[in-house]
């Protein structure tokens, strides 16, 4: 064996056999493990033939890892050769021990000796748990000690089997707590006790509330550093009786004590501080010491009580707000202010002269200290300002220092100007900060006194309020206002930071125009507040907008300026009245100022970028408006509003706002004069703000914008509404429609589209919108002019707002795919041709139909019908914008609402879903037009499939759909019952039936088509050859034929004339009595269930009637959508229908004689299936067949036209009518067929293979239909 070798690769395959001598079972077991590892390693080595040797050795090391885990008792692994043999021996012994039960003696905690038997394979942890459970001990609090036969402790691991250890005795003992931390002792409840000592000192001690005071005394004394022998505990300083030391704090109910040191020294010491304090209180230094204490106590407050208490002697006479404002400065500033105080007389009762001298000293010191810190100077200035009223020179110094912290400005000029202004006003302005602009404005008016006017006078007061002595302040409006004025005036350094920033802005803005303002330029430069005031009051009042425009330059601020009417946004305290007075005064001043005013306006323009455009032009305009007074303003505002908003709503808003502005500003005649300017300027502001957004207003059109922001908004919103309103019959309707559109968000479609093109019309000219005024003679034309362009532009890239709802509206039977530009082009072409046909057809539409169409709002076709009615009323170009049902729908919403179908827009959304259930049936002509446009759009969109979400409801399995139709008919059973007689009546008098039975869907559908048919019969017959096929075929066939026309729907695409597929109904209509009702019913039946036609007779027919119109195209297309349900063979339902139709035809000898018998039941079935198939085919092959279908339809219509023989169709339909007369019977048959489930599927399946095949663009179905029709004839 190779064991003597170092064995670099002990696990290699060749060595494995050598390493397996016939040994003990333990050794064999070990070798098995070893061999397994060596195998794995060998495979690895084999796979990696070029591994270096050290890697193999490392693998060897890994192989040894699984050596026996237990440390056997007597084993000594000393040499490299012994491990295998020794381990094998130990393993064998352990195996023997593990496999047998072991007798153990167990020593329980009370030295109780027990014996137990345990299997050798039980791990030690399990043994502990087992023994503890056996003897009812807690294993978590006990441990196991193992003793060998020699009474030696055996070390073990928790998972070591007991059999592997030579155990004689097991000791269960509680875990020793010595090694662990002692269990935490529950802390004693303690409370915080406040210990007062030495009168003014406090400390806090936490003690037990239950311990007697005598136990707490040492703790308290140590805390207070008293001698426990000389310490007495009192309730408080006043109490002379010591507390009972035997009682606890809880007994006494105390949480605060007073510790008194009764020793003589401590008493003396305690008295001395009191005396010293009392003396200090009388002296000057007491102030500082107090201030220090209080500052320590109130370190968090920036303002120290020192300033507040020490200053009142000076400041009470002056504005009280000053010292407090100054207190807001950093805490270090007060310290510097205190420096000059020591020289002051010690007595607080010193004369004011002394105080003023002191103030002068402070002033000088502050001047000296200005270099040290601007805050210091500010502090001194504030103090000196209060005292500075006496001397002008000092005031100038103060002013200079005051201005230093202010935004950069021309201080000397400002000072001189301020002094001049103060002199002019005769106001004792200590600060000398009367705004020159105020002087100019107020002085011409002779308003030198603050009482003269709240405007400039008040401003001067405000500015001077801070420096003024109390007398002048008393004259002022009040300290709070003066404080506000001081803030606004910027005279003192105490004004708020916001004002400082604003002043800086104003001063900077005014620097450039300052030169033009001879006297004002210094004011503006030096005191931004003056500029502010002038801007806020005079210029603003004169301009009326400057307040809102200059500082805010935003609508919110402009609104604020408007509400205040010249009131400075920074003088809210002054009040509206004061502002208005100031406005009037400032207007007068502006008049007097003339060029100055203009310069001020220019300055304001600098401030407000928004108003610059017309602020420049404003002075002249304002003067004219002021001269023209309120009337001119009203006229102007009215003119502007008229221009802006053709709709009365906008006018009303504009006029309203202008009048409100007049009222607000009209307190006095001056205000009226000012107000026109203000209003006009405000209107201009609004216009300017609005114009950039629209970019359609002309330069002259600035004024035309609404004076009120609301009006402006209405105008903006009305842009779209106005465009929609062009098509409205009256302004009121348009306004309402626009409002409805806004509320519903439906107008966005029109707004997005129309405004783009119509803005030129609406706003491009200042001339009022004549179409909006109600001169929309051809709203559709105006709409179409822009709309086709919009379609072309927008289809490729739908606008984000319209992507979901407007721009891309799913067409009937179409999946919700984005419209591709090529489609739009094709659609436009189709629509043009379609429009031509529709124009002719629409011309033929009776007025009654139009009204009925308007009333169709409840119909699922509401949106579509109104659109078609409009198209009928309007030139066909309308159809171009309507290429897609989505567009039609939106147009219908936007346009129909203007046309008086305002109720439609809200209802429009449900149009597609409710198609089958709506009580009102739109005229077939209109529906056909709509459907044609939609299906043509589909034709143009070959990818479009009849899966628009609107038709999801209609995309059910044909059987399911029929079920729904039958159910609906059941629900509308009252309707169907009347419909049956109505059907008969209609057959007798088809044209009357529509009017007589407008309520019933089928009848209504027929009635609508009948008038249309009467006029559009020729077109319908020719184009809606589709309709003719229904009459030709037996009722089932008629249904099939009608169904086939749905495939013809493409033809509606080609036939610009109203939706030829609906004409299918009209064609029955055309066969006035005959097809009108029966065909319509059957067709809906065919459309819905394809096999439903026979049941159509009753309620199903009625539902299809309403649906039929909508379904002519919609449902047929949608039926095409559920292709998986198409059936290839006549389903039981179809057979039942055929049988029923045959039975009816037999029942009616007329139909049989006319040739219903000519078509055998099989033929009828075939035709039925074919016709049904054709609708499916049409829907499926709509793209390809649509082009073919027109021809096919024409052919079928030609063939069917003879088949239209009124007698035959009437009889066939009369049989249908008879069926409908027995609604329950029909319903049962329908239900049975539907339940079979195979009927619809088979029908459609058959449809696809049999009829879908198109020969030369003509579907076999239509040809077969025509042949069948001819045969039947």
UniProtKB/Swiss-Prot annotation:
Tissue: Detected in embryonic first branchial arc, branchial clefts and limb buds.
Ranges of Basic and acidic residues composition bias in the record: 354-374, 631-643, 653-662
Domain named WH2: residues: 1226-1246
Short sequence motif named KKRRAP 2, residue ranges: 400-405
InterPro entries: COBL-like, Cordon-bleu_ubiquitin_domain
Family annotation (Gene3D superfamilies): Phosphatidylinositol 3-kinase Catalytic Subunit, Chain A, domain 1 (3.10.20.90)
Modified sites of kind Phosphothreonine: 183, 304, 328
Bias kind Polar residues: ranges: 314-330, 383-397, 485-495, 702-750, 763-779, 860-876, 894-904, 993-1002, 1187-1200
Residues modified as Phosphoserine: 248, 266, 300, 317, 366, 373-374, 384, 396, 518, 521, 541, 546, 551, 554, 645, 666, 770, 869, 896-897, 993, 999, 1028, 1092, 1214-1215, 1266
Molecular function as annotated in GO: actin monomer binding
UniProt keyword list: Phosphoprotein
Motif mapping: KKRRAP 1: 335-340
Chain intervals for the UniProt region annotation (Disordered): 1-25, 61-85, 290-579, 619-807, 860-923, 958-1070, 1090-1109, 1148-1208, 1252-1273
Biased composition (Acidic residues): 496-505
Family matches, as PANTHER family: CORDON-BLEU, CORDON-BLEU PROTEIN-LIKE 1
Name used for this protein in its record: Cordon-bleu protein-like 1
Organism: Mus musculus
């Amino acid at each position: 064996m190779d064991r003597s070798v170092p064995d670099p690769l002990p696990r290699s395959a060749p060595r494995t056999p050598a390493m397996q001598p016939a040994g003990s079972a333990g050794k064999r077991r070990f070798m098995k493990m070893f061999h397994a590892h060596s195998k794995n390693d060998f495979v690895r080595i084999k796979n990696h033939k070029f591994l270096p040797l050290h890697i193999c050795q490392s693998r060897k090391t890994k192989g040894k890892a699984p050596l026996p885990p237990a440390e056997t008792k007597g084993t000594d692994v000393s040499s490299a050769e012994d491990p295998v043999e020794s381990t094998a021996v130990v393993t064998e012994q352990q195996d023997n021990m593990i496999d047998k039960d072991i007798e153990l003696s167990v020593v329980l905690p009370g030295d109780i000796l027990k014996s137990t038997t345990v299997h050798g394979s039980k791990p030690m942890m399990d043994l502990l748990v087992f023994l503890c459970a056996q003897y009812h001990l807690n294993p978590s609090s006990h441990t196991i000690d193992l003793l060998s036969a020699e009474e030696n402790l055996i070390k073990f691991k928790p998972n070591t089997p007991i059999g592997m250890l030579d155990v004689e005795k097991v000791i269960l003992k509680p875990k020793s707590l010595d090694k662990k931390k002692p269990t935490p002792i529950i802390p004693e409840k303690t409370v915080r006790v406040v210990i007062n000592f030495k009168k003014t000192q406090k400390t806090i001690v936490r003690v037990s509330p239950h311990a007697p005071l005598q136990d707490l005394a040492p703790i308290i004394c140590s805390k207070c550093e008293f001698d426990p022998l000389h310490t007495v505990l009192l309730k408080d300083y006043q109490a002379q009786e010591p507390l009972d030391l035997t009682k606890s704090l809880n007994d006494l109910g105390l949480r605060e004590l007073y510790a008194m040191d009764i020793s003589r020294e401590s008493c003396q010491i305690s008295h001395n501080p009191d005396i010293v304090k009392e003396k200090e209180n009388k002296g000057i230094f007491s102030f500082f010491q107090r201030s220090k204490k209080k500052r320590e106590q109130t370190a968090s407050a920036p303002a120290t009580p020192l300033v507040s208490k020490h200053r009142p002697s000076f400041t009470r006479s002056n504005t009280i707000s000053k010292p407090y404002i100054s207190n807001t400065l950093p805490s270090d500033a007060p310290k510097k202010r205190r420096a000059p105080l020591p020289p002051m007389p010690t007595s607080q009762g010193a004369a004011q002269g002394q105080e003023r001298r002191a103030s002068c000293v402070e002033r000088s010191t502050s001047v000296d200290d200005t270099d040290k810190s601007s805050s210091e100077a500010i502090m001194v200035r504030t103090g000196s300002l209060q005292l500075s009223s006496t001397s002008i020179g000092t005031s100038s110094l103060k002013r200079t220092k005051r201005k230093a912290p202010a935004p950069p400005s021309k201080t000397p000029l400002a000072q001189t100007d301020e002094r001049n202004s103060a002199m002019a006003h005769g106001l004792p302005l200590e600060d000398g900060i009367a705004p020159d602009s105020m002087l100019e404005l107020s002085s011409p008016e002779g308003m030198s006194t603050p009482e003269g006017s709240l405007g400039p006078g008040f401003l001067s007061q405000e500015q001077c309020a801070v420096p003024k002595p109390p007398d002048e302040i008393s004259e002022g409006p009040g300290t709070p206002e003066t404080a506000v004025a001081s803030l606004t005036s910027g005279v003192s350094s105490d004004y708020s930071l916001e004002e400082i920033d604003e002043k800086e802005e104003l001063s900077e803005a005014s620097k450039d125009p300052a030169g033009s303002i001879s006297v004002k330029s210094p004011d503006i430069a030096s005191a931004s507040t003056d500029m502010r005031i002038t801007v806020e009051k005079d210029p603003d009042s004169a301009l009326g907008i400057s307040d809102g425009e200059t500082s805010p330059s935003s609508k919110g601020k402009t609104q604020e300026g408007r509400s205040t009417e010249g009131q400075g946004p920074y003088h809210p305290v002054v009040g509206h009245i004061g502002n208005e007075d100031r406005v009037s005064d400032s207007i007068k001043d502006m008049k007097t100022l003339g060029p100055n005013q203009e310069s001020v306006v220019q300055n304001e323009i600098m401030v407000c970028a928004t108003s610059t455009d017309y602020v420049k032009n404003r002075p002249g305009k304002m003067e004219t408006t002021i001269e023209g007074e309120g009337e001119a303003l009203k006229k102007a505002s009215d003119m502007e509003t008229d221009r802006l908003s053709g709709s009365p709503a906008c006018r009303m808003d504009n006029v309203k706002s202008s009048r409100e502005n007049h009222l607000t500003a009209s307190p006095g005649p001056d205000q009226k004069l000012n107000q026109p300017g203000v209003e006009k300027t405000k209107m201009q502001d609004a216009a300017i703000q609005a114009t950039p957004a629209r970019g359609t207003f002309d330069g002259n059109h600035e004024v035309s914008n609404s004076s009120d922001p609301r009006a402006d908004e209405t105008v903006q919103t009305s842009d779209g509404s106005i465009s929609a309103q062009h098509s409205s019959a009256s302004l009121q309707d348009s306004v309402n429609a626009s409002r409805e559109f806004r509320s519903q968000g439906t107008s966005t479609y029109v707004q997005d589209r129309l405004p783009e093109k119509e803005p030129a019309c609406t706003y491009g000219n200042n001339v009022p919108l004549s179409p909006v005024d109600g001169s929309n003679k051809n709203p559709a034309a105006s709409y179409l002019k822009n709309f086709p362009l919009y379609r072309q532009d927008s289809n490729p890239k739908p606008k984000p707002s319209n992507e979901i709802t407007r721009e891309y509206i799913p067409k009937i039977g179409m999946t919700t795919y984005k419209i591709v530009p090529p489609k739009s082009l094709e659609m436009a072409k189709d629509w043009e041709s379609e429009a031509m046909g529709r124009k002719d057809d629409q011309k033929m539409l009776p007025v009654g139909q139009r009204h009925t169409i308007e009333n169709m709002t409840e119909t699922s076709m509401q949106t579509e019908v109104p659109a078609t009615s409009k198209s009928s009323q309007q030139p066909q170009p309308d159809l171009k914008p309507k290429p897609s049902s989505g567009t039609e729908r939106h147009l219908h919403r936007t346009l129909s609402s203007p046309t008086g179908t305002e109720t439609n827009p809200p209802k429009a959304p449900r149009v597609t879903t409710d198609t089958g259930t709506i009580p009102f049936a739109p005229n077939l002509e209109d529906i056909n037009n709509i459907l044609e446009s939609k299906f043509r759009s589909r034709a143009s969109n070959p990818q479009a499939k009849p899966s628009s979400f609107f038709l999801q409801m209609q995309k059910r399995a044909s059987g399911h759909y029929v079920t729904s139709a039958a159910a609906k008919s059941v629900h509308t059973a009252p309707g169907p019952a009347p419909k049956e007689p109505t059907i008969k009546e209609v057959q007798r008098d088809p044209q009357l039936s529509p009017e007589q039975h407008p309520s019933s869907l089928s009848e209504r559908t027929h009635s609508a088509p009948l008038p249309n048919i009467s006029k559009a019969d020729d077109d319908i017959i020719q184009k809606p050859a589709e309709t003719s096929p229904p009459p030709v075929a037996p009722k089932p066939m008629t249904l099939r034929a009608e169904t086939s026309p749905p495939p013809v729907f493409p033809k509606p695409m080609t036939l610009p004339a109203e939706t030829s597929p609906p004409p299918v109904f009209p064609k029955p209509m055309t066969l006035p009595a005959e097809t009108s009702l029966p065909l319509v019913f059957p067709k809906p039946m065919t459309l819905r269930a394809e096999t439903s036609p026979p049941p159509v007779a009753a309620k199903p027919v009625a539902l299809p009637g309403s649906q039929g119109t909508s379904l002519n195209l919609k449902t047929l297309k949608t039926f095409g959508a559920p292709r998986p349900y198409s059936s290839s063979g006549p389903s039981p339902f179809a057979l039942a229908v055929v049988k029923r139709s045959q039975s009816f035809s037999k029942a009616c000898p007329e139909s049989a004689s006319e040739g219903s018998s000519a078509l055998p039941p099989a033929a009828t079935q075939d035709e039925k299936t074919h016709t049904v198939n054709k609708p499916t085919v049409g829907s499926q092959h709509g793209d390809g067949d649509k082009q073919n279908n027109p021809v096919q339809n024409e052919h079928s219509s030609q063939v069917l036209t003879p088949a239209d023989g009124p007698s035959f169709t009437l009889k066939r339909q009369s049989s249908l009518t008879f069926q409908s007369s027995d609604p329950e019977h029909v319903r049962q048959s329908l239900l049975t067929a539907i339940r079979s489930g195979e009927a619809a599927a088979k029908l459609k399946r058959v449809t696809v293979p049999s009829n879908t095949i198109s020969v030369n663009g003509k579907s076999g179905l239509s040809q077969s239909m025509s042949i069948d029709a001819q045969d039947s004839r």
